[in-house]
């Protein structure tokens, strides 16, 4: 292109210019026509706007519209109400649905329970049917057995008859046989027989031991195998589950690993794609940069062509002006500018008339030239070593054109060269780039220097004539370089990022240093001369006719021009070949700022051109016009100087900037205060109304621009200037007047002050630095017009300085809270800032794309259109871009401002929350002590109310009302105190804190009130909960005592007082010390009347207490830490008190029992003398203690025979009457809801023993001895019998149970008194003081010392089993001595029954008791005392064996048979007792039936008696003995077979039914206990069935073996061993048959009582005898050893139960629940098992 331009001659170009001018003329005329049309349209629009008639329709419809709005509001309100109603109905429907679901679920549960009950009923029915069938079978078996028995008996009688004949024949033998030899043989045979028996016994014992050991080992092995099998199964399941889990985890791990691999591959592919895209984009960018560079070169060449066209156009301007002067088609743009500058000061018209719009086309061209001039200066300082220094062909071409124009008399200043360029910083900023460069002064100077002084002088002579021409020329000279600069700047701006290897920061610094050095050197020459030169330079393009400017031109030396030309040439050449790389953000910012300033220049130019017609006033208004133009130019220069400020991390650069600006300001300018500026502006406003309007419009536009620029700056430079903050703080801000910036930018400082609040003063310092930098242009203007106010400047500066300090102080105060907030920057805010940066980057890309489109459009328009058309379209495009960019800037600013506000709110929220916590903690600490005091008062009042409630049981509602009222009063008090505490807490805070909370919208009073209220309510409820816990624990303590609600007594009344613990301690001491006196009996009748009232009070109290607890539980309990600790401490204290009371009771009972054992040891020494004391009555004192006093002495044996028949008949009649009464009472009680164990005392009828029936001392002696022996046999448990009822009383397992025997002989005590006093026997912990009775308890393992003492005392009258073989003679003697005592005690036995029956009903049972029916036992077979503690199988102590003459015995039995027949019918009544009552049926197995507890050593007492008699008469009475033995055997067999009338529930197929409702531990315990009973009482007709068949066989075997041993040991010394062995075999057969039948039919259950008839028992006995004809069933040989091995385990379980009993740790069981449990046989208070027997068994005894 350059070569083409060089080849084309100037003549051809002239021809082309003429044709172009013609086209331009047509274009301008078209523009004029369009302007006229626009003016008409504008007037029409104005007229339409002025008319207000069209708006009247609003008033017409306003009222209607308001009505409609009201109707709409009403409809909306109704809709809201309907929605509320709908929501409430929906909630109600949901509630009803929930209730329906609950009811449905309850119905389903009821159906399930009904089905289960039906199933249970069917099972019970089937069981009953089976039992009936079984009963029939057993009856048939019993008949068979009886038939076989008759046959066997006949055979035995025949054998006995034959044997007696043989004996008679043997006695008649010849005398040849010597008696001595016979005796020797008999003795030898007996020895041989004895040795064989001993050897057999030893072998059997060894085999039994081995077998038992083997069975035990087998059992253990089986158990271990079972456990191991279960363990193996559990481990297998666990292994399977672990394997499955392992597989699942492995699958999950593999899946996650695969997903991770896939994700990594996906990310790798994405990274590769992005890398490839990056490479592609780099290539595309390189191509685009290269294209842009080429376009830049093309643009430069085109700009040269346009310059050429402009010069030609100027040459023809004179002709065009003269030809078309009348129509003003072509007006001189220079003259227009001059007119505009004058118009700026005059401005007599607000709007430009239509006549003056003909120059719009040239004005528009001039505007575009002005817009295009300075943009290239932004990049002019960039240099590169690759650019050649030689002169380019373009420069040569311009030189040629310049020479041509000079020859024609026109001065063309210079080719468009790039002079000094202000660079744009690489930092993120929106303010660095402005269109006008900082070298405006030098450019004006260069242009002025190139003017010929001589020509100017000549033109000065004809100033008025030549002003327009010369002004036009000079304007063109200024505009041409500007246009070229603009074109070059566009091309450079589009391609500047192509050279990344050049550091823009370094180039910018270099250019800035050169610029500053040149400016400073220019003004250092002299202040006055420089000011005049600058004014001349600025004024020259406007009015050349000014003589001052001509003089200034003459003063300028032409040498500077020559020096500046080479430099400018080099700079222009370097710019033409070089680009600068900037970041994408800077490119977008550059385009925005450039368009903004172009818009301002356009507005200013339009304003200037509007004054074109005021040329005749140019001279007069020059002084007023020139300062305004200079003001505007200097404003633009200040913007350029702002651009030159480079924020960077390099402190040296900042020092260079500050240093250069400070020197520049100090040497050349004087600071001006705000007052001066206001006076100056007022002066300008007073000039004219039009000038004021123009200035306001100009400043308004400028302020809008500055606001947008400042907003951009605040968004982009906030983080960049932090690094330079410390350095910028060192700048002397006070020496500069910041109001000059306010004058030019009236809104900038306000915005900066607002930003200072959020940015900690950074932007204030930044703005200050900018003010320092911009002083050069602003103060240059103000210094010319404020020289008359210089005296006021220093004062105004001081005043302004003080004002700024106060403002900064206020800003600092106001920014205290934001500073605190800014310190707590969270991660979310950082992420938010990062997202903002990303959005800004995206916006920058979009702006860059818009700029590229603009550049492309500009290039296309440049190629296709002429110069004038290109300028016009470019200007319009720039205006549109400017509008779009300004809108985008405003949007960005609003978004950033909103984000800043959000972040500030978040920070304030965080700080507010922290302060809230501090406030709450502080208020809590202030009010905690007062709250504690109030809560203590509340606690005391609540305790008082509770005590008051306990004193008034019958008024249930009054305590609740009082308590609720007190609680409400306390709540009101607490609310008042909370308010006071809140006020005090608020006073402790500073005023700033309260204001801060109030400003942030938090109600501190409400927060504190809610917090303290919650704490107070929590502590209040905590205290009430503690009181409730205390009450519940006290109730548990009361109910843990095994006394019923009907027999609470004075103890519970004392527990209701506040001094419960002290009185409880005294009461526990009284339990061991108080002894009941007979004279106190009268008080007990009154106490029984008080008992019913007390029961009602207890019920009322429980209801009242429950209501109080419910009242306290209504509110939510929020426990404070201190309250939790307090409640725990209270509970611990209560537990300690309870444990102390229990320990005191136990220690007291231990002491009492030790004394009892010592006393008993002394009394046992008098056994041989028949002096024994017995407890014949038990009474209850004020504390419920038991005490019996009966001192009876034995004088002889003669009176026994006289009294026994009479006493027996009387007692039998009395007992028969009692049985009827008992049946009636039991049937009546069965109709009630429930009857508890302790309430059965009411069933006992009162029977008095009249004076005629008083017991004689001798009879009492036998009775006492009998009772003592019974007590021994029962391990310390008293056995009380009637004739037809036998009760088994089981006292507590603690050693508190005893009976006290005093030495007051002959004490008479009636049964009536006994029954009255025994009603209060309710607490098992109360003791029966029995100092002289031997007993054993399975109670507490802690009382072993007492038990050992008891055992030692028991060794005195009894011999252990181990030594029985050695001490047979002594044992036999003791047995003979006790025979008469045992028989005589039968007569007085019935008297015991009435007393003991009542005692049994009042004492709860803990361990199962055996039956007390058997009459016979051998003392020699008593187990060892040590074994009695270890094995309950051996726990029974044998009774004394009695023996009288056979005649006496027959008489006694005949009387008994009569009584049996009279009482036969009563047996059925006893068996028909309802299940719901606690049934007690007894049996009496003989006239003088003696309670005995037979263990494994059971045998017939009759056989033992006969053995003892035979032992006394070994040689004379053998025949009589055999006859009596046979008769006795028949009676024994019949008696033992038929006595089995008990309530049983036998299931052969389900032997373990007994324990189905028990847990594992209880099951084992109860099974073992049932086994014990079966072993101990096999000859009795009531006992529990074993847990399995093996145990039954073992029990039977043990009994047979023990009987064999006992019989053998009794008959060892008889002379005729054969006859004795035969009798023993018969007895073994009978006993084993009876034992087996008893074992098979025994079944006692905890689930209820099923009654079977006597026939069932008989059938069972017959069936058993058939199965085991030999009398010794298999599998019974090793039961004793096995039972002994199981003994420790059973004892341990028994101790555990007893310990629970002693400690009172029992669950609270209601009346109904306790009754139901008792009926099921497993009550939680541990009552003993009640077995039903009957007197009817005696009837079967006499059938044979």
Curated annotation (Swiss-Prot):
Sequence ranges of Polar residues compositional bias: 980-990, 1433-1442, 1576-1586, 1597-1621, 1629-1639
UniProt-listed InterPro entries: IF_conserved, IF_rod_dom, Nestin
Feature: compositional bias, Basic and acidic residues: 341-371, 785-815, 1074-1086, 1352-1367, 1386-1398, 1423-1432, 1445-1460, 1698-1709
Region (Coil 2B): 200-314
Stretches the record annotates as Coil 2A: 180-193
GO BP term (any one): positive regulation of intermediate filament depolymerization
Region Tail, annotated ranges: 315-1744
Annotated region described as Linker 2, given as residue ranges: 194-199
Keywords: Coiled coil, Intermediate filament
A GO term for molecular function: intermediate filament binding
GO CC list: intermediate filament
Start and end residues of each stretch annotated as Linker 1: 49-60
Ranges of compositional bias, category Acidic residues: 1034-1056, 1340-1351, 1368-1377, 1412-1421, 1496-1505, 1680-1691
Family per similarity comment: Belongs to the intermediate filament family.
Protein name per UniProt: Tanabin
